[in-house]
Amino acid sequence: MFNLPSAVEITINSLNSAGYEAYIVGGCVRDFLLQKTPFDYDIATSATPLETEKVFEGERIIETGLKHGTVTLIKNGMPLEITTYRIDGKYHDNRRPEDVTFTKSLEEDLARRDFTVNAMAYSKKTGVVDIFGGRSDLKNKIIRCVGNADRRFKEDALRIMRALRFASVLGFEIEKDTKKSIFDNRFLLKNISAERISSELSKLLCGENVKDVILEFSEVLEIVLPEIRGMKGFEQKNPHHIYDVLTHTAVATQNAPKETALRLAIFFHDCGKPDTFKLDEKGVGHFHGHPIKSCEKARCAMGRLKFDNATTDLVLTLVKYHDTAIEPIEKGVKKALNKYSPQVFFKLLDIKRADNSAKNPKYNNKSEIDLLEKLAKDILSNGECFSLKDLAVKGKDIINLGVPVGKEIGNCLDFLLRAVINNEVQNQKENLINFLKEKKLKQ
């Protein structure tokens, strides 16, 4: 028996008491069976939207999708989508049905859903309703379309990305007929909006099994990520590498922390390598300037997929500097903390670790990355100076020395910060002023 939130139970009971069927359906049933806490709850009912509104008269209801039979009830602060059992009409844009027909049959409603693991329903009265074998597929870790796979993907091509996402996140295999249909219908992804693609892609990249999905379904993913094409099978011909560019990328992506910006950054970090490849006289491959080229390509991809500005800026910074060396001594780390900010610095270390994990183990530099992290944490915990805001003198102190207001004030502050970072002077106001007078203002 599922432990439903009280708001969900009350809602189902209210519909039942008014003479209507009501079940939780879809992903929340799947999650319960996987012993996970559902993120949200969808309710399917035999009541029409107007009948649902009448049952909950006086309560807060938002008419979120009346055309498709959906209203959202706010119950005890929890939003619950309540949708009438329906049969979808014709799809003409590979995205959504032009119209729907309401039905009194739960089976007909479940038959229109994407995958068997998402086509189950549950109520306390009936237990799990599983008409299409979803429970068995969950147990066997299989993603299988409900009914005809070609029809499902032609109805809504985003289901292709959803299948890959479930394979990545859940670690499930995609059933052979469903898999064949994914490859056959992959070009339909061109009809899907960038926002819907990027939402699924973000979840896919953060999956446990993302490496296998990238490698097995690269032909599918390259429809939305053409950057993959040049990476696939591109041998690096360098002793530091044991994989081609795409395999290296897939392994590194799986080993990066599960954060959207980090996974996107590591996915794009080497996409510029094929464009910068040069063989030296010894037959060794080099990729001088590849971070800049990768950054350019990542900028195009992030814009095309309409990611938000904050995510895009972070991804591009991480891609641009992923291969930049940081001297593993205190002053080197202080310079990096000042350049990137502490937050970005630690994310950059995450990228370097993931990148390192997918290289030749002979050249593993994990210990150096660990040292960089330790030095940074010590600097921060000790409150040491690495940025202008930490400096013991401010602009007004420089002005009081007779330096005219303007660009020279900033030059003096930068001069002092460099001196503090290089251990030429202690970060104390009197020391800094004397140092400035002696070393710079005399000149």
What is each stretch, according to the model?
Residues 1-443:
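Catalytic cores of the polymerase beta-like nucleotidyltransferase superfamily
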